[in-house]
């Protein structure tokens, strides 16, 4: 028989840097999950992606066990890295803060494809281009 799910927790944690401090500790603690066990497993799974923010979806079961699925980093983080930016534009339609090429967009779309609700690579590229425009990044 399948285990009974008592909660799903969604967090965004820097790769390889999960620790019991907020936001991880309180989110897991209220569901009775062993926080250190999660931190060790997450850090081991994401150590090769250092420097990126990794979204994670944790499923907590009635017996206080858990499993988690890591997603691809947010498109905005990947675009900032590709354009070499610290932060996006506060006024994207007025102030353009950087540029990315179509090749950069294609690489990001290929990386994000499993998490995007897109039927084709072209559709995924259009989604990423839209994100870039809303951040004040010019696509060339």
UniProtKB/Swiss-Prot annotation:
Post-translational modification (record): One or more lysine residues are methylated.
Keywords for the protein's UniProt record, in alphabetical order: Methylation, Ribonucleoprotein, Ribosomal protein, RNA-binding, rRNA-binding
An annotated GO BP: translation
Entry-linked InterPro entries: Ribosomal_uL11, Ribosomal_uL11_bac-typ, Ribosomal_uL11_C, Ribosomal_uL11_C_sf, Ribosomal_uL11_N, Ribosomal_uL11_N_sf
Family: Belongs to the universal ribosomal protein uL11 family.
Function: Forms part of the ribosomal stalk which helps the ribosome interact with GTP-bound translation factors.
Protein's recorded name: Large ribosomal subunit protein uL11
Organism: Halothermothrix orenii (strain H 168 / OCM 544 / DSM 9562)
Gene behind the chain: rplK
């Amino acid at each position: 028989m399948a285990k009974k799910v008592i909660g799903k927790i969604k967090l965004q944690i820097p790769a390889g840097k999960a620790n019991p401090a907020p936001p991880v500790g309180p989110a897991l603690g209220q569901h009775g999950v062993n926080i250190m066990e999660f931190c060790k497993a997450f850090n081991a799974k994401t150590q090769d992606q250092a420097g990126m923010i990794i979204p994670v979806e944790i499923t907590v079961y009635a017996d206080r066990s858990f499993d988690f699925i890591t997603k691809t980093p947010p498109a905005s983080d990947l675009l900032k890295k590709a354009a070499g930016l610290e932060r996006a534009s506060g006024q994207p339609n007025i102030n353009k803060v950087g540029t990315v090429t179509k090749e950069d967009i294609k690489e990001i779309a290929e990386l994000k494809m499993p998490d995007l609700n897109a039927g084709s690579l072209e559709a995924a590229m259009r989604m990423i281009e839209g994100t870039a425009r809303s951040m004040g990044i010019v696509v060339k």
